[in-house]
Amino acid sequence: MPLEAQKVGVYACGPTVYDYAHIGNFRFNVWVDVMRRVLEWTGHEVKLVMNITDVDDKTIAGATRLKQSLGDYTARYTEAFFDDLCRLRIAPAEHYPRATEHIDEMVKLVERLKARDLAYEEDGSIYFRVERFPDYGKLSRLDPRHLRSTGRIEGDAYDKENIRDFALWKGAKEGEPSWDTRIGLGRPGWHLECSAMSMKYLGETFDIHVGGVDLMFPHHENEIAQSVGATGNPLAQFWLHCDHLIVNGTKMSKSLGNQYTLKQLLDEGHDPVAIRYLLASVHYRKQLNFTYEGLGQANAAVARLRELVLRLEKCTEGLALEGPGEGKAALQRADQGFRETIADDLNTSGALGHMFSLVKATNAALDCGNLASGEATAILAWFHDVDRIWALLPREQQLVERTIEINGAVLEAVGIPISDDNFELVTARMQARADRDFVAADKLRDRLVKRGISLEDTAKGVRWHVDVSGRSG
């Protein structure tokens, strides 16, 4: 139960804007978006806060390397992140607090910790005393007596009383940005940022805290220690962690050349909505194995759904008023199964399975003439209703049924929405065929096939379809 009836406060650990986000990052963002949409679909009002880490070791190193100000350096990647969220149809959070804009809140939190003797100063930096917080390690089920400094903590390389202690405030260093505050000249530690900003926008205790599974330790343990240490109250009622995305069964990394950005995939001609579908199709607590074959299958799945919705929209008036009831029964089964599975720890894969069972049953009923007009209307309304969660269906302005004039003839180009550059290839091929330049037309067709788009020439023009094969080669 939420702390306040029908209202849910959610804090999500957002990007560190030192580089362009990759599809592993967006697996998390799509999951958060689906979770938020499910909560809203079930009648809750959601307040989502996602931080932007725009000051840390990586952002400082990047800005220094390019001889840019920290603000200029991080602004480029922050803007790109928001652009990618839009392309993936991710609804915006209510707040995107930037770390550099909340220094005062962080200073106040450190002062509260010092007042409780949970923080100490050493050589200009301020650290949290882990040994004075007995619940440290409970979230990740680790014994604090056996913990070692790892990852981003070890990289801080600052002096401290105990190897397990972590930096709250880092003393100023030459060439690094710093703030002159009541607790000294320096900059915030990574963990401090999230504690201060989550409590500012959601209160000392809120409903749900989410992040990647790699953040459970040490980041979320440190957040809990700071926040609970300062307030004496739980930070969040529930902690949810999204598992990793891997590529072709292998960990994603720049060194292996398999760390894909959204822009890379879009430049290859892939539909961002199909990418969204793929990222949402596996339960969040399981690894998602990204492959181009899987992306092709996601393209095909989205196409099947969109084509059925378009079919239902066009055929409703021509259907019989009554039928054998196949459509009604299929809808009831799908709706019940969908609701049960999506409510079971956000089981997206199971819920999608129920949705596509209805796609299959509806197409079969239409093919046999066994779907009544009332059933078709109800099924169409159901698909639009659950799409409040998935955001897969074409928006009103994105329905692609265009007429093109070539050599004085008006031709039609009709199909599932595709990217503008792919549509330009479709148009160029239509022009080549009209000019009887069949060699050029065949080459353009081959380019589209490699992008997972097949063409069907008709007397009126051309139709396109998304293939299961996705990317070839």
Model-derived segments and their meaning:
Residues 1-89, 464:
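N-terminal, positively charged nucleic-acid-binding surface of large information/translation enzymes
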Residues 1-18, 29-34, 83, 104-314:
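Alpha-helical recognition segments enriched in aromatics with Gly/Pro capping
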Residues 45-47, 117-123, 454-456:
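Short, well-structured beta-strand/strand-turn elements
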Residues 52-57, 78-81, 91-106, 124-133:
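Short, glycine/charge-rich beta-strand/loop segments that flank catalytic centers
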Residues 61-65, 136-137, 223-224, 471:
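Short low-complexity, flexible loop/linker segments enriched in glycine and/or proline
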Residues 63-70, 94-100, 212-213:
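The substrate-binding groove and active-site-proximal loops of carbohydrate-active enzymes
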Residues 258-473:
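Structural preference for alpha-helix termini/caps and helix-kink/transition segments
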